[in-house]
Amino acid sequence: AISRSPSNTTEDESSSKQAPKMKTLIKICGLTTASAVECIIENSVDMAGFVFAKQSPRYITPKNAKQLADLIPKHISKVAVMLHPTPTEVNEVIDVFKPDYLQMDAKDFLNTYIPKSIESLKVYRDDGCLDLSLISDSKLTLFEGTKSGSGKLTNIEHSKAVSKKKRVIIAGGLNSNNVLNVLNKVGPLGVDVSSGVESEPGLKSEQKIIQFIRIVREYDEKKNNE
């Protein structure tokens, strides 16, 4: 490419150069059915989360998750969501499900071996003791409340403080009624929704998924036109 100095660039050339369009990353978590997976594919989400924590109503076995993940195109990242797993559980999920990302509490990664082919998605919780200096400046991370899947909205001011400094996905209690407010006030890199797009615990509503995605993409479009 030929570089031009500012003095050699005409006004028409300058106006034709557009800044990269902003796109909020969308992660739909807790997928358990083929219909929900097909819905997120058709509506262009960025990350698909499968929960391997047995205490969750969204729990899915690695084998069943692999069958659903095989439907997902490569441009959508597959995320294995685990909570305080044993090394054996981690190895089974990695071997059978073959995720792009492994999502766990940041502390869980300290004693867990992860192959270099898999990205880590560390979860930092809004527990009032968070040290921002511990969060990577370059790696994608997730910020949510003290308990996953509770449906409780993460503190807006705390989310804002984290998002200003880090590459953060905001999770915890998001739904179609509050995501726009969070986007406007926090402006995170991404949003993660689970219970907020369900008809009942563990069962995704395609209508709610579509509505949530539409609100986020309309926000993106408005921001890009400002």
At which residue positions do the language-model features occur?
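Low-acidity, Ser/Thr- and Arg-rich intrinsically disordered low-complexity segments
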Residues: 2-10, 14-16
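Conserved N-terminal beta1-alpha1 strand-loop-helix module at the mouth
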Residues: 19-226
